[in-house]
Amino acid sequence: MYFKKLNIKIDIPDYEVGEKQLEYGINIDDKFNGLWYSDLKVNDQIDLIPEKYKSDFYLSFLEANSFILPHSDSGPTAVINFYIETNNCATQFYEIKNNAKPYQIKNQTDGCVYNLDDLIEAESFIAEPGDVYILDVSKVHSVIPLDNTEINRKAICFSTNSLSFNQVEMMFT
């Protein structure tokens, strides 16, 4: 399994986006295209993570403004994304073909990027604002715009480096 939609409803909390911590992408015509993570201060309590697991997660704010290349994440093994804005994009997961040639972009650590020719499409989903999904970000995935509207995706991310997707999923069963 690559992802799981949680059947929960959370009101969008009052939050403040802080300093940008990490970005992946390129500048085109003096505009950054890609995704970035920022510090996040949530002014309201979000009761999503069970108490005994809270220390396994860190909170950040994800923003993306373009197609996101197929990649596996650097760092986190699983994330819980609480989508704020989605802009009609699909999150597509892939299986890796034999003899694939992954590569890394600047500031990737253990994650990799893949060419589409090296991948086989697997499952996908289209998130709506307010949706909460668990993602196995150790698996290759991309974000694909489904129309030509401007992309301004936003999500509150609960990320873990210490728990697997299956362990996170079990927290909600």
Residue locations for each model-derived region?
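Intrinsic-disorder/low-complexity, polar/charged segments enriched in Ser/Thr/Lys/Arg/Asp/Glu/Gln
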Residues: 1-5, 77-79, 122, 155
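Short, charged, solvent-exposed linker or helix-capping segments at domain edges/interfaces
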Residues: 49-50, 92-94, 167-170
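Catalytic core of non-heme Fe(II) oxygenases with the double-stranded beta-helix
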Residues: 55, 62-132
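A short, structural micro-pattern
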Residues: 53, 76, 150-152
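Catalytic core of Fe(II)/2-oxoglutarate
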Residues: 107-173
